[in-house]
């Protein structure tokens, strides 16, 4: 990827530009539902998006002016898969493995989002969850990401009667 800024300083530059372009180098694709279509079913954020791989503030309908400093679930999934295997399913490109793995004793944290529910259209909702780190070494934070794509690009904001596509945005923990 490539990009530029007349004012390359601060979080808007480091998150919206640097982290975004590094995300592309690890096969993280765009998450915004407006402006363009990646073709990889990653358009899971409404409007211009709000996470690192979105175009917050760049393409209407804008959700916010700059990206929040976190990757969406679809990017964590895809970038993580590429890091582990050196392969990306979407573009059929294999760079091979060039790392030296080191075993660590730290156990992965667990998360519990509670019961599954089907929420009818246009129904307000509030989500809660818990997390636990067996090693007690980390302060855990989390957020909720919707994982429903729509045929992008869309020029409209989410509508109350939509039955598919991104209907809500993630927020920083």
Spell out what each predicted region is:
Residues 1-173:
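Extracellular (secreted or membrane-anchored) zinc-dependent metallopeptidases
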């Amino acid at each position: 990827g490539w990009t530029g800024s007349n004012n390359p300083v601060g979080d808007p530059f480091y998150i919206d530009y640097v982290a975004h372009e590094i995300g592309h180098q690890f096969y993280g694709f765009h998450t915004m539902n407006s402006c363009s279509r990646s073709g990889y079913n990653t358009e899971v954020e409404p409007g211009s998006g709000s996470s690192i791989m979105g175009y917050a503030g760049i393409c209407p309908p804008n959700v916010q002016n700059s990206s929040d400093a976190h990757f969406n679930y679809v990017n964590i999934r895809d970038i993580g898969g590429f890091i582990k295997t050196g392969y990306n399913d979407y573009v059929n490109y294999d760079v091979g493995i060039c790392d030296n793995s080191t075993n660590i004793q730290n156990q992965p944290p667990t998360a519990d989002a509670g019961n599954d529910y089907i929420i009818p259209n246009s129904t307000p909702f509030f989500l809660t969850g818990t997390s636990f780190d067996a090693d007690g070494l980390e302060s855990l934070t989390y957020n909720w990401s919707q994982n429903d794509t729509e045929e992008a690009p869309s020029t409209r904001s989410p509508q109350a009667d939509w039955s598919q596509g991104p209907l809500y945005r993630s927020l920083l923990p």
